[in-house]
């Protein structure tokens, strides 16, 4: 069973056009939904060479809830589009979609290394990906792009809501004692409470939940 990908738009556009498109697509993102009958979860990450301009996207599929590796799909190519804050998906999405096309199994939900609604125009890479795949996607970022939050306690499981322009856009979650927290936000077709619960379910003592930890290793070709 192959992952079905919608044809939302092409990639030949200026930054100004991309921003306008983000505002349009953000209206289609769903921040509602819960998951049931879960057996597979995917993690997705993209690695970039600092010298050659090449990128490598990796998607890993793990069994849920035991987190055993089921499948790895990679896609490599040139990333000539420079990184522009807020437009990350226009640099990384073509490689990501190619990697998803290579999957033989269909994940029930996806963890994406990046923002979802915690984005200036409410369309980070996790939300953009969710619209292409029409699947539940959770944004799980290692750093903040927008928003303010109250300090967290040191214990694993402590959290603080993330607000941007007085709107709740995500949650800052500490997944391991004494390490920097993760920035969780809705990507598509899932509510924030469910997203945070599933991220916590996927953690096994590391800062990153297992799907993203494996995706990071796969993108760097370490697994």
UniProtKB/Swiss-Prot annotation:
> Where, subcellularly, is it found?
Cytoplasm
Q: What class of enzyme is it?
A: hydrolase
EC code? 3.1.21.7
- Protein residues bound to Mg(2+): 45, 113
Q: Which domain of life is it from?
A: Bacteria
Q: Which GO terms describe its cellular component?
A: cytoplasm
Name any Gene Ontology BP term: DNA repair
GO MF annotations in UniProt: deoxyribonuclease V activity; magnesium ion binding; RNA endonuclease activity, producing 5'-phosphomonoesters; single-stranded RNA binding
Q: Is this entry keyworded Nuclease? A: yes
What's the cofactor?
Answer: Mg(2+)
Q: Which UniProt keywords apply?
A: Cytoplasm, DNA damage, DNA repair, Endonuclease, Hydrolase, Magnesium, Metal-binding, Nuclease
Which residue numbers mark the site Interaction with target DNA?
83
Q: Which reaction does it catalyse?
A: Endonucleolytic cleavage at apurinic or apyrimidinic sites to products with a 5'-phosphate
Q: Does the keyword DNA repair apply?
A: yes
- Give the record's family classification: Belongs to the endonuclease V family.
What this protein is reported to do is described as:
DNA repair enzyme involved in the repair of deaminated bases. Selectively cleaves double-stranded DNA at the second phosphodiester bond 3' to a deoxyinosine leaving behind the intact lesion on the nicked DNA.
Q: What is this protein called?
A: Endonuclease V
What organism, scientifically named, is this protein from? Dehalococcoides mccartyi (strain CBDB1)
Name the gene that codes for it. Answer: nfi
């Amino acid at each position: 069973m192959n992952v079905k990908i919608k044809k939302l738009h092409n990639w030949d556009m200026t930054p100004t056009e991309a921003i306008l498109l983000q505002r349009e697509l953000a209206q289609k993102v769903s921040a509602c939904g819960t998951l049931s009958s879960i057996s597979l979860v995917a993690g997705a990450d993209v690695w970039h060479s600092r010298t050659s301009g090449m990128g490598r996207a990796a998607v890993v599929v793990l069994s849920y809830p035991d987190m055993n590796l089921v499948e790895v799909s990679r896609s490599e190519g040139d990333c000539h589009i420079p990184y522009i804050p807020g437009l990350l998906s226009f640099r990384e999405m073509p490689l990501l979609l190619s990697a998803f096309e290579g999957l033989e199994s269909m994940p029930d939900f996806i963890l994406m290394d990046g923002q979802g609604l915690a984005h200036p125009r409410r369309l980070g890479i996790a939300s953009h990906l969710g619209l292409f795949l029409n699947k539940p996607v959770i944004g799980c970022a290692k750093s903040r792009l927008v928003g303010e939050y109250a300090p967290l306690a040191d214990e694993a499981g402590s959290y603080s809501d993330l607000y941007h322009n007085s709107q709740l856009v995500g949650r800052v979650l500490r997944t391991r004692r004494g390490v920097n927290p993760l920035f969780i936000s809705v990507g598509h077709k899932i509510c924030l409470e469910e997203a945070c619960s599933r991220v916590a379910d996927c953690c096994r003592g590391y800062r990153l939940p297992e799907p993203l930890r494996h995706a990071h290793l796969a993108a760097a070709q370490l697994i």
